[in-house]
Amino acid sequence: MSDAAVDTSSEITTKDLKEKKEVVEEAENGRDVPANGNANEENGEQEADNEVDEEEEEGGEEEEEEEEGDGEEEDGDEDEEAESATGKRAAEDDEDDDVDTKKQKTDEDD
């Protein structure tokens, strides 16, 4: 019974993180997030992803191996974005705030 409750919570958390990730990506790219939250589909990015998938299917096995290597690099970018969505970037920002605070104290002492 407790497993079901945890399951529901994790689904909500995952959804929230996805939405937050989209907001972060849109802010970094300078685009507004659509009201329905389907940023990729409205901006045509979803269609571009589908075209890449079709090219991979049509390509030979040799091309797939090369693309898999490229995919690993892209996965690294996604991991960085996911980390920022989970608060790692927020923690780094907090560290910056601490530095600013120290500078202010130094300025006041002078």
Curated annotation (Swiss-Prot):
PTM comment text: Covalently linked to a small RNA of about 20 nucleotides.
Listed Basic and acidic residues bias regions: 13-31, 100-110
Residues bearing the modification Phosphoserine: S2, S9, S10
Modified residues (Phosphothreonine): T8, T13, T14, T101, T106
Modified positions (N6-succinyllysine) in chain numbering: K15
Compartments reported by the entry: Nucleus
N-acetylserine: residues bearing it: S2
Record GO biological process: negative regulation of apoptotic process; positive regulation of transcription by RNA polymerase II
GO CC list: nucleus
N6-acetyllysine carried by residues: K15, K102
One Pfam family, short name: Prothymosin
Keyword Lipid biosynthesis among record annotations: no
InterPro entries hit by this protein: Pro/parathymosin
Keywords (A to Z) from UniProt: Acetylation, Isopeptide bond, Nucleus, Phosphoprotein, Ubl conjugation
Residue positions where N-acetylmethionine is found in the record: M1
Cross-link Glycyl lysine isopeptide (Lys-Gly) (interchain with G-Cter in SUMO2) per UniProt, renumbered positions: K102
Highest taxon of source: Eukaryota
Acidic residues biased stretches: 42-83
Sequence segments annotated as region (Disordered): 1-110
GO molecular function: histone binding
Similarity comment text for this entry: Belongs to the pro/parathymosin family.
Subunit structure: Interacts with NUPR1; regulates apoptotic process.
Function statement: Prothymosin alpha may mediate immune function by conferring resistance to certain opportunistic infections.
Official protein name in the record: Prothymosin alpha
Organism: Pongo abelii
Lineage, top ranks: Eukaryota, Metazoa, Chordata, Craniata, Vertebrata
Gene: PTMA
